[in-house]
């Protein structure tokens, strides 16, 4: 099992309930694929360094997980498809 840090940015025009449901959905994707979520940090709404898909702001989420690569690959695949996530990155943490 490896440690990963996932950072994703949610589009700013979502209401709180929809944003929370999105976070839960993606956390469940990780859990269903055998990942153990060790920490979830909500950085809140922040200004982007540059415009992404005509948005100047976004809600930042940081998720630390311990999992096999399969779970992170599925998260990555679904995040690419989702219109609600405007940017994401997955980083493998060093041991």
From Swiss-Prot:
GO terms for biological process: translation. It holds the Pfam family Ribosomal_S6. It comes from the Bacteria. Keywords: Ribonucleoprotein, Ribosomal protein, RNA-binding, rRNA-binding. Gene3D superfamilies: 3.30.70.60. GO terms for molecular function: small ribosomal subunit rRNA binding; structural constituent of ribosome. GO terms for cellular component: cytoplasm; ribonucleoprotein complex; ribosome. InterPro entries: Ribosomal_bS6 (IPR000529), Ribosomal_bS6_sf (IPR035980), Ribosomal_S6_plastid/chlpt (IPR020814), Transl_elong_EF1B/ribsomal_bS6 (IPR014717). Belongs to the bacterial ribosomal protein bS6 family. Binds together with bS18 to 16S ribosomal RNA. NCBIfam families: S6 (TIGR00166). HAMAP family: Ribosomal_bS6. This is Small ribosomal subunit protein bS6. The lineage of its organism: Bacteria, Bacillati, Bacillota, Bacilli, Bacillales.
């Amino acid at each position: 099992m490896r440690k990963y840090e996932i950072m994703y940015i949610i589009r700013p025009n979502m209401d709180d309930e929809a944003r929370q449901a999105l976070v839960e959905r993606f956390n469940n994707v990780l859990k269903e694929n055998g990942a153990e979520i060790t920490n979830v940090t909500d950085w809140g709404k922040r200004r982007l360094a540059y415009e992404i898909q005509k948005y100047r702001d976004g809600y930042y989420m940081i998720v630390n997980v311990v999992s096999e690569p399969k779970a992170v690959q599925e998260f990555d695949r679904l995040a690419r498809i989702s219109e609600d996530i405007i940017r994401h990155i997955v980083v493998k943490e060093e041991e």
